């Protein structure tokens, strides 16, 4: 898949979600989350919420193609960025819970791809003019992530355990990972935008290694989190197509956030 515009990104993600649903492939979990983020960004572009809608279409297309390239490389010969290999490599591991699959995708896409896409959209000094729209895209991402995580609760009855043993100050674990990462992503975007090709390659490699290390911590956490994950996994739905369909419709359920603290 190579997207030319944001509509192509939405269509490409919808295709992956459809295919994953048919095949019972957990790659559809993050793809469903990401499809909804992209639909919300497109709605914001059409609604004139960004300073420069055409620029954000370009940004989102570059961002989406980073995911499609990683997905295609993994499917082809298990290659691609390290952090995406970590995420895709856990798709067949029965012990990984739904929310881990989501966080692994969010980790790779924010900690590696977001900064690269931003720097390519607005290279050099132009990067500073992107900041407001960059933060707005992150707000949209955070909102969709929270809604999807709330919807995971219906499939994963003991998910709230993670907040108690793993996340600081009772913050939802996915929300924390998004907000923690976005300021770093902006810093790295500014860094990349001002670098030459050789410097940029070295920075991208460093970001990939760091995101891959984070992915390993997400996949195999220590301490109290591990037994909590085993308990959560034992009560989660095993019906992968049903989970994908549920996640893919999270934004269409207005009541999903009610009753969540």
Q: Can you say where each PLM-predicted feature lies in the sequence?
A:
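Acidic, low-complexity proline/glycine-rich segments
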Residues: 1-12
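Long, charge-rich C-terminal accessory regions
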Residues: 120-187, 192
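Internal, hydrophobic cores of structured domains that mediate oligomerization or house catalytic pockets
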Residues: 48-150
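A cross-kingdom marker for long, charged
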Residues: 174-261
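N-terminal interaction modules that seed assembly of large macromolecular complexes
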Residues: 20-68
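Short, charged, low-complexity loops and linkers
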Residues: 13-24, 90-94
């Amino acid at each position: 898949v190579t997207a030319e515009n944001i509509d192509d990104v939405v269509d490409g993600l919808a295709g992956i979600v459809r295919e994953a649903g048919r095949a019972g492939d957990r790659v559809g979990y993050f793809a469903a989350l990401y499809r909804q983020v992209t639909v919300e960004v497109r709605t914001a572009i059409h609604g004139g919420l960004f300073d420069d809608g055409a620029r954000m279409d370009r940004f989102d297309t570059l961002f989406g193609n980073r995911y499609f390239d990683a997905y295609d490389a993994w499917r082809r010969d298990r290659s691609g960025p390290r952090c995406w290999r970590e995420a895709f490599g856990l798709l067949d591991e029965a012990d990984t819970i739904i929310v881990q699959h989501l966080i692994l995708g969010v980790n790779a896409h924010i900690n590696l791809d977001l900064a690269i896409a931003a720097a390519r959209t607005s290279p050099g000094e132009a990067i500073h003019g992107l900041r407001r729209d960059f933060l707005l895209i992150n707000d949209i991402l955070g909102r969709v992530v929270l809604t999807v995580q709330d919807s995971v609760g219906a499939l994963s009855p003991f998910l709230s355990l993670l907040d108690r043993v793993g996340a600081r100050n009772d913050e939802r674990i996915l929300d924390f990972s998004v907000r923690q990462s976005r300021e770093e992503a902006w810093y790295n975007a500014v860094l990349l935008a001002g670098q030459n090709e050789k410097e940029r390659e070295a920075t991208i490699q460093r970001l990939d290694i760091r995101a891959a290390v984070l992915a390993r911590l997400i996949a195999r956490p220590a301490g109290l989190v591990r037994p909590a994950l085993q308990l959560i996994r034992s009560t989660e739905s095993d019906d992968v197509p049903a989970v994908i369909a549920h996640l893919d419709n999270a934004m269409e359920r207005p009541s999903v956030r009610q009753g969540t603290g």
